[in-house]
C-alpha cells in the first residue's frame, strides 16, 4: 500500500557537494530527486545542463542566476526546462537555501565545453549513502 512518508529534514545532515555547496536529500526516485541546496555566501554552482525540468524555490538568502543576470530572493521561484544551461552564485552575507525538485541527469560543463561531472538521481543517492557510511550514520529511507 502506498502512503505518505513524513519525516523531519533536521535529522538529515548537510552533505558537501563542492566548495561552499552542500545538500540535504529529501527524496530519490528513478525519475528525479527532491533536496535542499545550501550555498555559503559567495559560493558558485558551476555551469551545468539539466536533462529534465527543475523547480527551485528559494527559502532563504539571495542567489544570482548568472546567465539570466537575475537575483532570486526568499520566496522566489525558478522553473528551468529540460536542456537549460545555467550557473548561479550566492550573493549577500547569508547562506542561500533552495528547495529543488529536479528530474533526470545534470552535467557540469567546463571552460572548454567538456563535461566535468554527471549527476543522476542514482549517483546523488550513492553520494548520500557514502556520506552516511563514512560518518557512521544510519541512512534515512528516502526512496
Residue ranges and their predicted role:
Residues 28-29, 64-87:
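Short acidic-glycine-tyrosine-enriched beta hairpin
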Residues 18-20, 29-49, 81-85:
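Conserved short histidine dyad/triad with adjacent acidic residue
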Residues 1-33, 114-143:
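A short, N-terminal "cap"/entry segment at the start of jelly-roll beta-barrel domains
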Residues 41, 50-67, 73:
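Glycine- and acidic-residue-biased ligand/ion/polar-headgroup-sensing regions
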Residues 34, 44-45, 61-65, 77, ...:
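Short beta-strand segments in beta-sandwich/barrel cores
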Residues 22, 33-35, 52-54, 59, ...:
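A generic structural signal for short beta-strands and their flanking turns/coil linkers
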Residues 27, 57, 89-90:
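Well-ordered beta-strand positions
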Residues 69, 82-111:
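Ligand-binding loop in jelly-roll beta-barrel domains
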Amino acid at each position: 500500500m502506498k502512503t505518505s512518508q513524513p519525516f523531519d529534514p533536521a535529522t538529515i545532515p548537510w552533505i558537501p557537494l563542492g566548495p561552499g555547496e552542500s545538500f540535504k536529500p529529501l527524496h530519490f526516485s528513478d525519475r528525479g530527486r527532491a533536496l535542499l541546496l545550501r550555498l555559503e555566501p559567495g559560493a558558485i554552482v558551476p555551469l551545468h545542463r539539466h536533462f529534465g525540468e527543475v523547480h527551485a524555490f528559494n527559502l532563504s538568502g539571495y542567489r544570482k542566476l548568472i546567465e539570466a543576470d537575475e537575483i532570486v530572493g526568499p520566496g522566489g521561484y525558478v522553473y528551468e526546462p529540460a536542456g537549460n544551461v545555467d550557473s548561479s552564485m550566492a550573493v549577500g552575507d547569508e547562506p542561500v537555501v533552495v528547495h529543488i525538485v529536479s528530474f533526470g541527469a545534470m552535467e557540469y560543463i567546463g571552460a572548454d565545453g567538456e563535461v566535468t561531472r554527471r549527476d543522476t538521481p542514482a549517483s546523488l543517492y550513492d553520494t548520500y549513502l557514502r556520506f552516511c557510511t563514512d560518518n557512521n550514520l544510519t541512512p534515512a529511507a528516502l526512496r
